[in-house]
């Protein structure tokens, strides 16, 4: 189903009972987090906080708090009563689409050639279009009117350093690429018009910024942040879209209609384009540092001094409660100065929180897991299922089900998964099992681990590999080890012993008891 903007999606959710309006006064300082957390854990609806007692904008929370709403946002109209299972299964179709776009198979005949041409035409037809007089610029704040404190920016946890923008869709462009990058990076409020842009070094926005700083030393770097885009664009920014396809094009494919864009209006930022029907847009720059920077506080990490980007204004970010369930360390990141804020009339502020799973990122991880499966199966046909348990903080542990064909096969699959998608670069643990193990049932996975693994033979340790920057368990920030567990049945060459045969009841006996079951009244 097509959703032209966030309001359209909110209306649809309300119609099908997936959104609740909250008229009571709920503070964006801690209270919204507690309420959204309880509702998410209960599998409840999205929440629209409408009270203006403390702020002038309604706040939308828990938007993607169930896999069904993620599927709806991706254009899959999961029916009421089907549950999250049906929604997750439908998301594999999105994965098959991505798989075809990433590595299209050569046509086997005229019919296949026609399908390939139709897919290519669909992608071409989804090229975004620029519109004039966009709704996202109905209201413009400039000069001293630019005051981020007027937005209901959440403070999520008691130990947080301050208010935090959590669902900002950051738009950047590097000097060496024709396409824009869309990324979701948290942003700490530190002043009337200043935010800390927390993008990690490997993320697209940080790469664009470094390349710009190298080629344009001393020049301000333009940035736009979108708050409240349509669901297809938001989800396109967190999906492994092929490098040859822009997130705006992919959003158009999901939506079934071209993405309408608007040029930013701030001089110097007008080279960036944002969704024309976005609720709120922040426009501005990362400026070069003026004068000597103040010294780092006692006990804080040193300021960045290497690289062209170090010459730009930076500030100490955090600590903040994160998706790991812990407060992260403080670190230096660039400062984004907001020069203009544009918005729609009666704009909606879209927000979330992150914390110990389950949270909204964990739910997104469960949903995107289904998108990953066809991508992996296209590359590794022996993989029969794949699961990222939400308790593993979205991606830190993966369970792989496979059809094993030779000794050492499971280890090949481990290294294949680690190297296939950027998303799996930070997966610390991979457990590989056979087809007879339900990888979504921890009881079965633990049974396979404890009965099919010899720790010395079946454990793979890889040291000094890229690790999530937030993983404080690693000995060095961003660098740590990985573990693979081969919980498959062992083949000749992997063991000299007679391997155990699983106990299975005779089918005829099971059928006989099936017929007696109702009579027995058990």
From Swiss-Prot:
UniProt keyword list: Cell membrane, Decarboxylase, Flavoprotein, FMN, Lyase, Manganese, Membrane, Metal-binding, Ubiquinone biosynthesis
Name of the gene this protein is made from: ubiD
Membrane topology summary: Peripheral membrane protein
Reaction equation(s) it catalyzes: a 4-hydroxy-3-(all-trans-polyprenyl)benzoate + H(+) = a 2-(all-trans-polyprenyl)phenol + CO2
Pathway(s) where this gene product acts: Cofactor biosynthesis; ubiquinone biosynthesis
Protein name stated in the entry: 3-octaprenyl-4-hydroxybenzoate carboxy-lyase
Any single Gene Ontology cellular-component annotation: cytosol
UniProt source species: Paraburkholderia phytofirmans (strain DSM 17436 / LMG 22146 / PsJN)
GO biological processes: ubiquinone biosynthetic process
Family of this protein: Belongs to the UbiD family.
């Amino acid at each position: 189903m097509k959703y032209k903007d966030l309001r359209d999606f909110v209306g649809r959710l309300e119609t099908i009972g997936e959104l609740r309006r909250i008229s009571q006064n709920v503070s964006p300082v801690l209270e919204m987090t507690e309420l959204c957390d309880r509702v998410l854990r209960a599998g409840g609806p999205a929440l629209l906080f409408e009270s203006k007692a403390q702020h002038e904008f309604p706040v939308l929370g828990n938007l993607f708090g169930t896999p069904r709403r993620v599927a709806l946002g991706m254009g899959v109209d999961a029916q009421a009563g089907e549950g999250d299972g049906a929604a997750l299964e439908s998301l594999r179709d999105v994965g098959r689409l991505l798989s075809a776009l990433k590595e299209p198979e050569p046509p086997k005949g005229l019919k296949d050639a026609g399908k390939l041409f139709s897919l290519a035409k669909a992608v071409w037809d989804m090229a975004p279009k620029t519109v004039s007089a966009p709704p996202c610029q109905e209201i413009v704040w400039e000069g001293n009117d630019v005051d981020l404190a007027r937005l209901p920016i959440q403070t999520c946890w008691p130990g947080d350093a301050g208010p935090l923008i959590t669902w900002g869709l950051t738009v950047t462009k590097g000097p060496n690429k024709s396409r824009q990058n869309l990324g979701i990076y948290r942003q700490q409020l530190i002043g009337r018009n200043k935010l800390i842009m927390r993008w990690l070094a490997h993320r697209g926005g940080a790469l664009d910024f470094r390349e710009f700083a190298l080629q344009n030393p001393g020049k301000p770097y333009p940035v736009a942040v979108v708050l409240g885009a349509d669901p297809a664009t938001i989800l396109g920014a967190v999906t492994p879209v092929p490098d040859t396809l822009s997130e705006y094009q992919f959003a158009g494919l999901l939506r079934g209609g071209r993405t309408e864009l608007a040029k930013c209006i701030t001089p110097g930022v007008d080279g960036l384009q944002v969704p024309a029907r976005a609720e709120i847009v922040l426009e501005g720059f990362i400026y070069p540092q003026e004068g000597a920077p103040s010294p780092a506080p006692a006990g804080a990490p040193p300021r960045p001094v290497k690289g062209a980007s170090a010459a730009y204004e930076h500030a100490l970010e955090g600590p903040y409660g994160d998706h790991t369930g812990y407060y992260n360390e403080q670190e230096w990141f660039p400062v984004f100065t907001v020069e203009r804020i544009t918005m729609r009339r009666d704009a909606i502020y879209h927000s979330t929180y992150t914390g110990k799973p389950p949270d909204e990122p964990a739910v997104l991880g469960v949903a995107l897991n289904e998108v990953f499966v066809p991508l992996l199966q296209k590359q590794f046909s022996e993989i029969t299922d794949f699961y990222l348990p939400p308790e593993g903080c979205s991606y830190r542990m993966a369970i792989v089900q496979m059809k094993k064909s030779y000794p050492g096969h499971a280890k090949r699959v481990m290294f294949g998964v680690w190297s296939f998608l950027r998303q799996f670069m930070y997966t610390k643990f991979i457990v590989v099992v056979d087809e007879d193990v339900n990888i979504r049932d921890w009881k079965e996975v633990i049974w396979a681990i404890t009965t099919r693994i010899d720790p010395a033979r079946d454990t793979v340790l890889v040291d000094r590999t890229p690790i999530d920057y937030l993983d404080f368990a690693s000995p060095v920030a961003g660098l740590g080890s990985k573990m693979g567990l081969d919980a498959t049945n062992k083949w000749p060459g992997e063991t000299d012993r007679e391997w155990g045969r699983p106990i299975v009841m005779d089918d005829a006996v099971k059928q006989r008891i099936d017929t007696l079951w109702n009579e027995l009244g058990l």
